[in-house]
């Protein structure tokens, strides 16, 4: 028999399912970010979580024959949620979906929004991979990006994440930043490589000046000193 080529129907028939869950809350908007996010009160967060739980229930019915092998909780800043809220979210997913025993469950974490206790609660809830938004080790570059942390704050979160039990950690860094040089980028990369233990993954992104962001407005005025 000739091997049958795979069509679109084969894709829909596969049994694995990957979930992306968006948490659209931030302390403040970074200068480069065009993702859906905004500040929120506790009431807003609770209302969003209630709506999210309802959507999970509805979506689960559509994929009752699938097994979840991967979950990515992104944003926004998911780590603005409490450990209890993340625990409730994971409980709801496990109640509604069939989960693979080795499912990778990633959550984005921003320094300045977590404590050692909160990280332990995330780990207990079932999060088994963290993606920490470092972006740069340089104070001026972080300031230009509108980030709320410094390198020391990142190092504290990284250390506390390891102490909480996380053994699978990704670190985000960015290139092409305002005021960045090859030397400063190399210094950032070397600092990441010298973390103990070294992160299991490093995601290196190049800055894209997106329409509608503060960086785009600065670029139009000729005020964005890109390398």
Predicted regions located by residue number:
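Single conserved hydrophobic/aromatic residue that forms the stacking wall/gate
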Residues: 1-12
């Amino acid at each position: 028999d000739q091997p049958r080529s795979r069509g679109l129907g084969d894709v829909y028939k596969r049994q694995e399912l990957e979930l992306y869950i968006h948490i659209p809350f931030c302390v403040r908007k970074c200068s480069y970010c065009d993702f859906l996010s905004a500040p929120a009160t506790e009431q807003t967060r609770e209302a969003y979580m209630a709506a999210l739980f309802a959507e999970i229930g509805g979506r689960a019915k559509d994929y009752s024959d699938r097994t979840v092998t991967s979950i990515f909780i992104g944003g926004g800043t998911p780590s603005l949620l409490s450990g209890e809220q993340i625990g409730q979210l994971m409980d709801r997913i496990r109640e509604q979906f069939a989960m693979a025993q080795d499912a990778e469950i990633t959550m984005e974490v921003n320094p300045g929004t977590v404590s050692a206790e909160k990280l332990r609660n995330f780990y207990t809830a079932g999060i088994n991979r963290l993606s920490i938004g470092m972006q740069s080790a340089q104070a001026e570059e972080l300031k230009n990006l509108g980030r709320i942390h410094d390198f020391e704050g990142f190092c504290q979160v990284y250390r506390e994440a390891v102490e909480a039990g996380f053994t699978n950690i990704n670190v985000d860094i960015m290139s092409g930043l305002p005021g960045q040089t090859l030397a400063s980028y190399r210094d950032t990369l070397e600092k990441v490589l010298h973390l103990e233990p070294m992160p299991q993954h490093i995601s290196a992104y190049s800055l894209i000046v997106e329409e509608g962001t503060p960086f785009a407005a600065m670029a139009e005025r000729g005020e964005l000193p890109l390398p």
